[in-house]
């Protein structure tokens, strides 16, 4: 059971925690090519842990549930995330599998390529989730990503639907999503590529229009699965919110910055969004706040290290067009 009182409002993040091994170079290598002259850095990462850091730094009480190895990387994860103020008391240590690792290559424009060895993350199972049922049902907002097994994700949302939490899915890395999951979530947050791939995986007809109209139509189709909000992140172009119940589309611009590292920007967005929803903000206002936060994160190296604090976001949001 968590250290937090069960009647406190909190963000619950369930997902992955990795060690990120980053190489920064002028450009990304092509298949079969070696690019030299880069610099190396080691950071804590994993979509779930990144989002937990973003949530807690932006002011929300935050609980993280995941599975990490009984190894030095796992020790670092537990220590560092606890120091951030995240409740890690429900994290499972796996004696049989190593902690997850991500190898990340980043070019001079901040664009990246990532390869992940999930390790213990991929052994977070349904029984681990059932043991945490009360924590899940009593969360104010819940975020899950797809670096853990799909059957585990399905169990999470089944349990969450017995409570009143705001259920958010970040469908990354994208893979086929059972209809039972889509019918159990309130908000889905894909990037543009994930939106179109999910639309195709769900066997909707090909959309002939381009640009914003294509995003809106894909969002409408996916929302008909029963999802209240489809929020599509567009990187430097901001994001588009589709509200199914109101039939309203809202475009949120971003803040122009000099991006040096986009790793973790989406995680920053998701974690901060969950934090603001936990505090009672509307979806549109929460998205604006999350957009401002992500615009800070891309100006810094590292995933968790780049996550801004509440006071920084409060200043940055004043620059939103």
Each language-model region and where it sits:
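Glycine-rich phosphate/adenosyl-contacting loop at the front of the ribokinase-like
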Residues: 1-67, 72-86, 258-259
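Active-site-proximal loop->helix
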Residues: 72-84, 102-106, 110, 128
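A glycine-rich helix N-cap at a beta->alpha junction
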Residues: 84-96
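Conserved phosphate-binding/catalytic loop of the ribokinase/pfkB sugar-kinase fold
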Residues: 93-94, 104-141, 146
